[in-house]
């Protein structure tokens, strides 16, 4: 069996961990530069706020209704996500982190039985006096209580509410987690372990919300009169093959209980991107743009090394706003291919900067009546790494001038120091020190778990 642990309204839940006064109150989290709503608590959803609502349009309404507003605090969210994943690793030897707030894990009766036996020896009344033998006679009770305990323990230890789905496939487990999140009667865990439960769950689940069903496929299914996951799952395999691609066929098989995505099958990213929109009127200083691109390239290489990969292709882009008619428009978008695949940040940063400098516009000397400011105001920039392959084995070059072994040790040392003492402890000079391209985050909460200056102060009197 496969389980999925899904954090409920994750960003909002993170903001509530150190603000218990917000429990039961509406909360929203804003995107980069406080642009739009990207996360809502259940109370905020009940007030009618939608994902993607432009902040400037709903700001007055949010304030009038007493909604707590937060800028996105990704450092805090990442730290709490790591705590949740660490907790999950205590319950299952194999976990697959799917996103910052979701993780698949292996779940079976024998594992749950061993777990309960170990814990009931220390806490004999922990499970309402139901013995292990009695639980073993009711496998559904065993697995359900196993999932419910995971949900309860993560909430108690980390402060993040999670919903658990347990089923035979990853797709069914995701559906189970949705039911566990929506209906409190499941006690944090929805178990789909029989055909009867599977069909009942699918009959209540909209087909457009199924993992793996995109918008175009959903529209096509709707045109065919298929509105629920059960209607789709009940179709014959030959019909699915004749109308859809192999990816949709895999989803159909998963809905019918045939596992097509194993617990260890995490597809390696085909590309890695780090980008950012800049606040206010954008950036006009070439040095600041270079600093930003260097930082984005470093972030990409960190992700690359974390997944044990190297890359050969690099793309850099930057553009001005299309909506500001008072300044000139300009777009940078170019790529290059390295001779040897690498994950060393000095190589990738150097390549990214060479692209930017080669394409950066020359200053415009003469102004126009409709455009008095002739400087280029860049509103967004980013770096994309592609042609990604595993670090081992790596194609070598007999005439490579770089000592790859020495370079790898250097990267490992930098990563270790930055993990221990915080991001940016060791950095390249081109990255700067004062982050002159930082986001607009007026409603930013503190970094309670990673910044010693933001640690909560407890009054003892």
Model-assigned labels for residue ranges:
Residues 23-25, 160, 312, 330-334, ...:
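A generic structural signal for short beta-strands and their flanking turns/coil linkers
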Residues 120-125, 331-334, 397-403:
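Short intrinsically disordered coil segments
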Residues 98-102, 167-170, 309-313, 376-380:
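Short Gly/Ser/Thr- and Asp/Glu-enriched loop/turn motifs at secondary-structure junctions
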Residues 114, 173, 324-327, 391-393:
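Short acidic/His/Gly/Ser-rich catalytic and metal-binding motifs that mark active-site loops
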Residues 337-461:
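Acidic, metal-coordinating catalytic segment for phosphate/diphosphate chemistry
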Residues 1-256, 263, 404-461:
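Gly/Gly-Pro- and Ser/Thr-rich, intrinsically disordered tail segments characteristic of DNA damage-repair
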Residues 209, 217-375:
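DNA-contacting surface of Y-family translesion DNA polymerases
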Residues 103, 310-324, 381-393:
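Core structural elements
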